[in-house]
């Protein structure tokens, strides 16, 4: 049986919704079963990787640092949408909490098209 390539897309900001935390939990669980995982951050999802967040000030759980351990789970294909960064006034050279490749929307779509399963959070 051929191995499925699985993509996780984060589209929402880290606070105000549980989507990011749930997506990260699903990603970690899937990493135990699959080695071919890609992680994509688009739209407000790029905010998931900003350093120095203080969610405890809004009484939210700080799960963001957990993204930084993805390489320990052999999850190394991580991508940020360049246009999403520009729209939010963020630099593609920022000190993200995870090593990522910044891609243009066209390149991001092309890369995403190589995955068999796409899960969006």
Curated annotation (Swiss-Prot):
UniProt keyword list: Cytoplasm, tRNA processing
GO biological process: tRNA processing
Intracellular or extracellular location(s): Cytoplasm
Assembly mode: Heterohexamer, formed by a dimer of trimers. The hexameric TusBCD complex contains 2 copies each of TusB, TusC and TusD. The TusBCD complex interacts with TusE.
Role description: Part of a sulfur-relay system required for 2-thiolation of 5-methylaminomethyl-2-thiouridine (mnm(5)s(2)U) at tRNA wobble positions.
Annotated family: Belongs to the DsrF/TusC family.
Name of the protein in its database record: Protein TusC
Organism expressing this protein natively: Yersinia pestis
Lineage, top ranks: Bacteria, Pseudomonadati, Pseudomonadota, Gammaproteobacteria, Enterobacterales
């Amino acid at each position: 049986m051929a191995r499925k390539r699985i993509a996780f897309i984060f589209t929402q900001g880290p606070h105000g919704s549980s989507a990011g935390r749930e997506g990260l939990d699903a990603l970690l669980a899937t990493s135990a079963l699959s080695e071919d995982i890609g992680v994509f951050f688009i739209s407000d999802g790029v905010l998931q990787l900003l350093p120095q967040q203080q969610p405890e000030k809004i009484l939210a759980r700080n799960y963001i640092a957990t993204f930084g351990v993805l390489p320990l789970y052999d999850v190394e294909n991580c991508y940020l949408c360049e246009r999403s960064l520009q729209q939010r006034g963020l630099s593609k050279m920022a000190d993200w909490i995870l090593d990522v490749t910044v891609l243009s929307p066209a390149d991001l779509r092309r890369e995403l098209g190589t995955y068999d399963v796409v899960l969006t959070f």
